[in-house]
Amino acid sequence: MTQIGTPLSPTATRVLFCGSGELGKEVVIELQRLGVEVIAVDRYENAPAMQVAHRSHVINMLDGAALRAVIEAEKPHFIVPEIEAIATATLVELEAEGFTVIPTARAAQLTMNREGIRRLAAEELKLPTSPYHFADTFEAYSKAVEDLGFPCVVKPVMSSSGKGQSLLKSTDDVQKAWDYAQEGGRAGKGRVIVEGFIDFDYEITLLTVRHIGGTTFCAPVGHRQEKGDYQESWQPQAMSPVALAESERVAKAVTEALGGRGMFGVELFIKGDQVWFSEVSPRPHDTGLVTLISQDLSQFALHARAILGLPIPLIRQFGPSASAVILVEGQSTQTAFANLGAALAEPDTALRLFGKPEVNGQRRMGVALARDESIEAARAKATRASQAVNVEL
């Protein structure tokens, strides 16, 4: 049986977050509601989740020694990776020493790198994926492009939020896509994956939670991406029963192989009744922000319950819902948001402003949420709310 102590006392249940962005912030809030003591770690000060945690630490999370020092000092009952860019080899060591990593250290390690998870899905689990090659050099990359043909997609094996990702349509794109991939990788220059392009009808995120009572799926989330970054999402995405059943089969196979407990965002391509595995995040997913308005238990509440070993008997869906991001472009350390009354004037709308301490270039600083009678109406309403927000840099 799960027992939760008193925060900041010897009986406290301590959860440490590696990464403190807007997704982590919502999970921290859910854990705070259950009386959990939360420690937030990131590479910069005043990150969103730090603002709602009991305390925080600023370290380079790719530095294994620094990560180990914080974890050994804090002695958390649960370590929760919130981003990919972490010294995952250190998490594997810590797990072997008795710490609990959510969902598992292996899941964090495999999904930090597109190669690990692609080989697991395609080669071990024999799940349908796009055709692919990995390449370390421009020569190997050029050969991979030639082999797969146009159009094709190139991504650094280590990157997030679409960084370094390109769609190649002709030989004119080959050099610039390689250069962009080399700039966009998280751990510096290097290896890329080249994928054959799947002419899909739509893509979904199947939010899949592994918990004490088994595996539960949220209704499928549809989304629209630009340059690999999510702009809007909606739930439920209309699908054929065959495609939905196959999506759940694929998601269950991948999440079972990764193991542990927690929320997983499984990204899939759909064409008719066909399903291809794309990627998986072993944590809440940005497109799943829509669940803040679409479900009685958001993906963040579900993650918190799963982490703590609490049951998830039912997920109630409230009907057609959507999210639209609030993107800010420019430079500021004192961004202000105005016209919020207009943004929230319609019924069944909500806003989340993430409280990020600065913007330098383009950054997702918030999200508008809406429910309506249809997906089209919910999307339009969320977009109206998002566009109504005036940003002052």
From Swiss-Prot:
Pathway: Purine metabolism; IMP biosynthesis via de novo pathway; N(2)-formyl-N(1)-(5-phospho-D-ribosyl)glycinamide from N(1)-(5-phospho-D-ribosyl)glycinamide (formate route): step 1/1. Keywords: ATP-binding, Ligase, Magnesium, Metal-binding, Nucleotide-binding, Purine biosynthesis. ATP binds at residues 114, 155, 160-165, 195-198, 203. One of its GO terms (molecular function) is magnesium ion binding. It comes from the Bacteria. Its EC number is 6.3.1.21. Mg(2+) binds at residues 267, 279. Residues 119-308 form the ATP-grasp domain. One of its GO terms (biological process) is 'de novo' IMP biosynthetic process. It catalyses: N(1)-(5-phospho-beta-D-ribosyl)glycinamide + formate + ATP = N(2)-formyl-N(1)-(5-phospho-beta-D-ribosyl)glycinamide + ADP + phosphate + H(+). Gene3D superfamilies: 3.40.50.20, ATP-grasp fold, A domain, ATP-grasp fold, B domain. Involved in the de novo purine biosynthesis. Catalyzes the transfer of formate to 5-phospho-ribosyl-glycinamide (GAR), producing 5-phospho-ribosyl-N-formylglycinamide (FGAR). Formate is provided by PurU via hydrolysis of 10-formyl-tetrahydrofolate. Homodimer. This is Formate-dependent phosphoribosylglycinamide formyltransferase. It comes from Pseudomonas syringae pv. syringae (strain B728a).
